[in-house]
Amino acid sequence: MADKQIERTLIILKPDAVVRGLMGEIISRFEKRGLKIVGMKMIWIDRKLAEKHYAEHKGKPFFEPLIDYITKAPSVVMVVEGRYAISVVRKMAGATDPKDAEPGSIRGDYGLDVGDAIYNVIHASDSPESAEREINLYFKPEELFEYCKAADWFYHTHARSKKEYLDSMDCLER
């Protein structure tokens, strides 16, 4: 990731995305946008991990309902990489409250407001610092992978061919 515009960010497909069967549709959106999944797993977030993740919200009125929500069923956690990944993913996710999220955003299309709670299907890191902290909460370094996507060479402006790109990325040696 020598290019400073290339970032990694954490995404959580929350329990409602999992139990509603929305995982594939949501993951597909990130891939279609050109983001590369470098780590992904399904986990059941326990209370201890949830409290670490949402520590900045401790003491706020929505803290306990948030912890209950994120620990209610399995989640999919993933790390994606790409140019300006943090802001791209945040924009794709949409406003936190589904009623404020634009149609076409993930929360605008799939989030639910059921009166006493909102189910917004996705978490996305909000800054480089948060992304680093959150990635380290959920992934060990050996669970994140460097690889070349087949189409990367096409967009790589310095390479004149796929072979030149792959050679520069050391992909053929792996």
Swiss-Prot record:
One of its GO terms (cellular component) is cytoplasm. Its cofactor is Mg(2+). InterPro entries: NDK-like_dom, NDK-like_dom_sf, Nucleoside_diP_kinase, Nucleoside_diP_kinase_AS. Keywords: ATP-binding, Cytoplasm, Kinase, Magnesium, Metal-binding, Nucleotide metabolism, Nucleotide-binding, Phosphoprotein, Transferase. The keyword Metal-binding applies. It is an enzyme of class 2 (transferase). The keyword ATP-binding applies. The active site is at H123. It is found in: Cytoplasm. SMART domains: NDK. Its main location: cytoplasm. GO terms for biological process: CTP biosynthetic process; GTP biosynthetic process; UTP biosynthetic process. One of its GO terms (molecular function) is ATP binding. Its EC number is 2.7.4.6. Major role in the synthesis of nucleoside triphosphates other than ATP. The ATP gamma phosphate is transferred to the NDP beta phosphate via a ping-pong mechanism, using a phosphorylated active-site intermediate. PANTHER family: NUCLEOSIDE DIPHOSPHATE KINASE (PTHR11349). Belongs to the NDK family. This is Nucleoside diphosphate kinase. It comes from Thermococcus kodakarensis (strain ATCC BAA-918 / JCM 12380 / KOD1).
